């Protein structure tokens, strides 16, 4: 996993290089390409993951698993339509926890289960509020398009400061109880500084793409392939892609239809993030279950 993280850091600096050479429009196009490939791909094999988890516990019928999964996605879509403020709030919370869990789970910090979950959520919220505070105009526009609620910069600032304070308390607590993690914490603080630079100089979509793909999706793909097939190599990765391909294509077709119906940028961004949210809810639950299962399987 450390090699994967190092690759992600190198790719992030390559993303900064793109920012310095190309226009904002190019960043947006490239960002969507990355999201529609690696980003969608990393969440396209949830059904297979559920099957792998079931194989290790109790086998669940495929149609039952698929029905529950689609019902969860459908419920998220309906919630976004009728209760957009609630849906967006839940999306941010689920995404924050999901990002934090993926980023920290492999570190083996030996924290209590409750503290770990709180820390994952707070770290993920810190990343998201950093993204929001450094791209306020675009964020305010997208939130207004989704919810018809108009935020201002102060709302984003207060959310960031509150999250930063909570993160500081968590880090201090970890260092007091587990001083052996000092090098890990210092490295993570440096990586957060890198994110600040990336988010500051990039457009919202490109900044989100860099984090979502290089820092989240690629490490997640590694974890998923290793969990399903027991190893990560060229053969297992292609098996993963082959299994994910039908779900990936369906997702792309859905996004393409939405784009051709709503070509207005703001509306499309709103629908795009709503779509990401709809698949995030079940995906986050599946990944949490995967990590829980790995803890009970020493060979994983």
Feature map (PLM): residue ranges:
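N-terminal membrane topogenic signal
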Residues: 1-11, 62, 242
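Hydrophobic, membrane-inserted alpha-helices
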Residues: 11-17, 68-77, 189-198, 255
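Short, hydrophobic transmembrane alpha-helix segments
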Residues: 15-29, 261-265
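Alpha-helical transmembrane segments and their membrane-interface exit regions
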Residues: 35-45, 92-104, 213-224, 276-282
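C-terminal ends of transmembrane helices
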Residues: 43-53, 97-110, 169-181, 224-229, ...
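Membrane-interface helix-loop-helix junctions at boundaries between adjacent transmembrane segments
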Residues: 55-62, 74-133, 141-151
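Alpha-helical transmembrane segments of multi-pass integral membrane proteins
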Residues: 93-97, 102, 118-138, 157-173, ...
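Membrane-water interface signatures at transmembrane helix termini and the short loops
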Residues: 183-223
